[in-house]
């Protein structure tokens, strides 16, 4: 059975940890930054025996797959701290934005594989997507192991490292775009007389259903949109207002800006 270590249990690391422990199998070693955070983690996961809160050296020595979820500025110090404890054949997966494969390979000892990854927070509920970019010497078996470890958190997609910026814009940061849209819809629903709870239930399920339609049918978004849009109807009128306000252009600009920052 695979042992997975998670270094850093903030927003992203915590989401991955929750996804793994709620839906997966195997031992999970959680490494917190401070003793206070470690105590908090022990209390939070007291009912999940698969989770053990340990220090970084212990996690490095025991784990097969190492998920590095600390802030980008802290990656180099963490890897320097654990490199002498990492076992040959183990895999280090960095979730830190902007930390390149070259940086990882340089920081790791020979025989330890490096993978750059970008997950997203829906991993917490098993509906995430993690984009993986393996170093050249990562074996098919090691990459498959990483995919199996992350499977409880959602899907995985393997892309070359040069596409990590675009992937971040379309996946890593994308939940925030949808939350903003739903937030605006809920506010508008309240203005139309709905309670906030009812507006959130309606808009949230619409977002969930639309996402499922895209993934499960494999059809283009434009085709699915057309199926909902009757000529001269209320949906067509609403979409015309969105186009008039430049929503399509704003989204394209947001994605490009995010990709530039993340690349």
Please give the residue ranges for each predicted region:
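Active-site capping/gating segments
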Residues: 31, 116-131
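NAD(P)+-binding Rossmann beta1-loop-alpha1 motif at the extreme N-terminus of oxidoreductases
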Residues: 1-57, 61, 190-192
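Rossmann-fold NAD(P) dinucleotide-binding segment
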Residues: 55-108
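Internal alpha-helical scaffold of NAD(P)-dependent oxidoreductase catalytic cores
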Residues: 44, 103-113, 129-167, 179-217, ...
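Hydrophobic/aromatic beta-strand patches that form the interior of the parallel beta-sheet core
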Residues: 29-31, 93, 115-117, 157
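NAD(P)-dependent Rossmann-like dehydrogenase/reductase catalytic/cofactor-binding core
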Residues: 204-263
């Amino acid at each position: 059975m695979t042992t997975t270590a998670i270094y850093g249990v903030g927003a992203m690391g915590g989401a991955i940890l929750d996804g793994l422990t709620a839906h997966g199998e195997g031992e999970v070693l959680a490494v917190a930054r401070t003793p206070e955070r470690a105590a908090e983690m022990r209390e939070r996961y007291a009912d999940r025996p698969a989770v053990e809160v340990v220090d970084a050296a212990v996690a490095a020595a025991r784990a097969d797959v190492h998920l590095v979820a600390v802030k980008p500025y802290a990656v180099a110090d963490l890897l320097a701290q654990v490199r002498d404890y990492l076992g040959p054949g183990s895999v280090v997966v960095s979730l830190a934005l902007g930390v390149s494969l070259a940086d990882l390979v340089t920081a790791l000892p020979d025989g330890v594989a490096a993978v750059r990854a970008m997950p997203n927070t829906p991993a917490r509920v098993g509906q995430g997507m993690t984009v993986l970019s393996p170093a050249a010497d990562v074996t098919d078996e090691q990459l498959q192991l990483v995919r199996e470890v992350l499977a409880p958190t959602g899907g995985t997609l393997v892309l070359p490292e040069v596409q990590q910026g675009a992937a971040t814009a379309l996946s890593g940061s994308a939940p925030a775009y949808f939350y903003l849209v739903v937030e605006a819809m809920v506010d508008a629903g309240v203005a139309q007389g709905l309670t906030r709870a009812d507006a959130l239930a309606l808009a949230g399920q619409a977002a969930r259903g639309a996402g499922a339609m895209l993934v499960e049918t494999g059809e283009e978004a434009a085709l699915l949109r057309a199926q909902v849009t009757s000529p001269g109807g209320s949906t067509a009128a609403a979409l015309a207002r969105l186009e008039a306000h430049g929503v399509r252009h704003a989204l394209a600009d947001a994605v490009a800006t995010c990709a530039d920052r993340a690349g």
